[in-house]
Amino acid sequence: MALSVEEKAQIVNEYKQAEGDTGSPEVQVALLSANINKLQDHFKANGKDHHSRRGLIRMVNQRRKLLDYLKGKDVSRYTALIGRLGLRR
């Protein structure tokens, strides 16, 4: 269920701000979004998996916090990111 090393590297390369950047809000939000999408597919087949659902809710909350932080720091980066990821709001 977790992202493979190749998938993570591809996401980091796509959303990085500078060479060697793995911790910027854009990269973190993109990685969380990919994990969230994978878990949503898992719940279509395993609806009663409440332990994983708790992890999903935690990831959604962490992504929301990072997006709020980015919105407060730089609105243009925030709007560009949610546009690229196809998120609401």
Curated annotation (Swiss-Prot):
One of its GO terms (biological process) is translation. SUPFAM superfamilies: S15/NS1 RNA-binding domain. GO terms for molecular function: rRNA binding; structural constituent of ribosome. It holds the Pfam family Ribosomal_S15. GO terms for cellular component: cytosolic small ribosomal subunit. InterPro entries: Ribosomal_uS15, Ribosomal_uS15_bac-type, uS15_NS1_RNA-bd_sf. The keyword Magnesium does not apply. Keywords: Ribonucleoprotein, Ribosomal protein, RNA-binding, rRNA-binding. Disulfide bonds: none annotated. The keyword RNA-binding applies. Belongs to the universal ribosomal protein uS15 family. Part of the 30S ribosomal subunit. Forms a bridge to the 50S subunit in the 70S ribosome, contacting the 23S rRNA. One of the primary rRNA binding proteins, it binds directly to 16S rRNA where it helps nucleate assembly of the platform of the 30S subunit by binding and bridging several RNA helices of the 16S rRNA. This is Small ribosomal subunit protein uS15. The gene is rpsO.
